[in-house]
């Protein structure tokens, strides 16, 4: 229910940015969090509200990946990010389907050249989302100089 409410198509005033995948350090889930004051200004602009959705899991043996999850969960509790940064628990195929079909922008910013494919961006593009990506994974092959 939370996902349906967050991705409400009747709220076109909110730009929804999605990042949902396995949490590994090279995927840089927390890159946008490096300048928190700037991020707070961007997300809380009353003229252009933005929602940043995260979902995913770390491998059980990946302690740095689990630390990234904790960092995002702590951030979403900070007063300036409540309701603007959201981590959705219990990531699975059903939730992934909702996210790739409901986000306006799909974020892909791994350390190049470590992303083998990054198929979530393909699924988001097929559903009409814009991809905000570096040239790695599938985007390195799809980009032709005229399409983005």
Language model features with spans:
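Nucleotide-activated donor-binding/catalytic signature segment of Leloir-type glycosyltransferases, i.e.
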Residues: 43, 54-98, 103
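Conserved donor-binding/catalytic core segment of Leloir-type glycosyltransferases
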Residues: 12-27
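A conserved mid-protein helix/loop that constitutes part of the nucleotide-sugar donor-binding site
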Residues: 24-40
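Short, conserved catalytic or adaptor-binding loops enriched in Gly and charged residues
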Residues: 8, 74-80, 142-144
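Active-site proximal loops enriched in glycine and acidic residues that flank catalytic Cys/His/Asp
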Residues: 19-21, 36, 54-58, 89-91, ...
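Glycine-rich phosphate/pyrophosphate-binding loop
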Residues: 1-12
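Residue-level recognition of the N-termini of beta-strands and the immediately preceding loop/turn
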Residues: 14-16, 48-52, 83-86
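Catalytic binding pocket for nucleotide-activated donors in carbohydrate/polymer assembly enzymes
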Residues: 41, 48-51, 98-148
């Amino acid at each position: 229910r939370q996902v349906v409410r967050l991705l409400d198509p009747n709220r076109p005033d909110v730009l929804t940015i999605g990042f949902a995948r396995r949490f590994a350090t090279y995927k840089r889930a927390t890159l946008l969090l490096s300048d928190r004051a700037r991020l707070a200004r961007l997300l809380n602009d009353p003229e252009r509200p933005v929602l940043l959705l995260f979902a995913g899991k770390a491998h059980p043996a990946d302690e740095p990946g689990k630390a990234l999850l904790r960092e995002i969960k702590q951030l979403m509790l900070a007063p300036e990010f409540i309701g603007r940064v959201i981590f959705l628990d219990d990531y699975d195929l059903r939730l992934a389907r909702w996210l790739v079909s409901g986000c306006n922008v799909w974020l892909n910013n791994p350390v190049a050249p470590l992303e083998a494919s990054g198929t979530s961006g393909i699924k988001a593009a097929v559903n009409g989302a814009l991809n905000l990506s570096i040239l790695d994974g599938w985007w390195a092959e799809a980009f032709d100089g005229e399409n983005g």
